[in-house]
């Protein structure tokens, strides 16, 4: 079956009445990944994390080993078999770090035009995820590096 990610995004935009200029945040996971399950069961269940995700992003969960073909930003992606498993080309393209390696979970933030903004591999607890979501969701990544943002954010928390 063909899954058209663009149509899913458009449908969700209409359904949730969200802005079309929102960033897309994709959680690349696999069924066998323990840290992916922990991210689902702990981090994503945090009310503040959920609110930030829905405020600033169009959230998508994507099984990196999905055998379904899909289209995104006009580009077709298919399943690429490898041994007894394989990886979807969408994950290979959007979740790969330099050198072509993918770790799970991986969170990728994509512009509304389909351009990768950041690829972040590994588990994040709720506090780290909130900071990550604020940094990208509020556009701080355009004007300062993450370490500077984190220091400023932590200082502000101490004075509030």
Residue ranges and their predicted role:
Residues 1-3, 111, 116-160:
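Non-globular targeting/processing and membrane-anchoring segments
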Residues 1-23:
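A short beta-strand-turn-helix
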Residues 8-12, 44-45, 90-92:
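N-terminal post-signal-peptidase region of extra-cytosolic proteins
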Residues 19-34, 59:
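Short active-site neighborhood of thiol/selenol oxidoreductases, capturing the structured segment around
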Residues 23-25, 102-106, 141-146:
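Surface-exposed patches in mature extracellular/periplasmic domains of secreted proteins
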Residues 37-41:
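Detector for the c-type heme attachment site
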Residues 43, 47, 123-126:
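Short, conserved loop/turn and helix-capping segments at secondary-structure boundaries
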Residues 47-49, 54-118, 131-139:
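Thioredoxin-like thiol-disulfide oxidoreductase module
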């Amino acid at each position: 079956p063909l899954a058209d990610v663009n149509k899913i995004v458009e449908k969700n935009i209409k359904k949730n009445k969200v802005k079309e200029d929102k960033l897309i945040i994709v959680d690349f996971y696999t069924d066998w990944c323990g840290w992916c399950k922990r991210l689902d069961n702990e981090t994503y269940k945090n009310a503040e994390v959920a609110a930030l995700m829905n405020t600033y992003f169009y959230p998508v969960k994507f099984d990196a080993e999905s055998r379904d073909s899909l289209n995104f930003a006009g580009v077709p992606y298919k399943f690429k078999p490898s041994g007894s498993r394989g990886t979807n080309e969408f994950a290979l393209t959007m979740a790969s770090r330099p050198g072509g390696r993918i770790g799970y979970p991986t969170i990728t933030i994509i512009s509304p035009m389909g351009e990768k903004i950041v690829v972040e591999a590994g588990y994040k607890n709720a506090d780290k995820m909130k900071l990550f979501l604020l940094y990208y969701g509020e556009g701080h990544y355009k004007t300062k590096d993450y370490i500077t943002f984190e220091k400023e954010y932590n200082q502000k928390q101490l004075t509030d």
